[in-house]
């Protein structure tokens, strides 16, 4: 299986995901629980892997992360300050 990478990374949101999660005072487990309420099947280990840049993020996961964390996708992807 081919590993997908962009500039050596599996995802481009890992740094800002941590910032947004911590700004909302959420643990990885709490974030996973909020995502599961939106029917996104993601657990604490998956959140950890995303934050450690060891897992890709699907488009629907990105949109749900934005919804739960109240941020724009462009910000999460590093386009906006």
Regions found by a protein language model. Name each.
Residues 17, 31-32, 47-50, 76:
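Conserved hydrophobic/aromatic packing and binding residues within compact polymer-binding modules
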Residues 37-57:
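Recognition helix of helix-turn-helix/homeodomain-like DNA-binding domains
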Residues 12-15, 25-26, 42, 57-60:
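Residue-level signal for the short linker/turn that defines the boundary of a DNA-recognition helix
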Residues 75-81:
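Short amphipathic recognition helices of helix-turn-helix/homeodomain-type DNA-binding modules
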Residues 15-37:
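Short basic helix-loop element that most often maps to the first helix and adjoining turn
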Residues 54-75:
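DNA major-groove recognition helix of helix-turn-helix/homeodomain DNA-binding modules
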Residues 1-13:
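A detector for short, charged/polar N-terminal pre-domain segments
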């Amino acid at each position: 299986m081919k590993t997908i990478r962009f500039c050596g990374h599996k995802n481009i949101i890992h740094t800002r995901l941590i910032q947004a999660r911590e700004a909302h005072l959420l643990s990885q487990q709490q974030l996973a629980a909020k995502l599961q309420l939106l029917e996104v099947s993601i657990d604490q280990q998956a959140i950890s892997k995303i934050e450690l840049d060891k897992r890709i993020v699907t488009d629907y996961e990105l949109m749900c992360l934005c919804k739960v964390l109240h941020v724009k996708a462009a910000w999460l992807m590093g386009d906006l300050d």
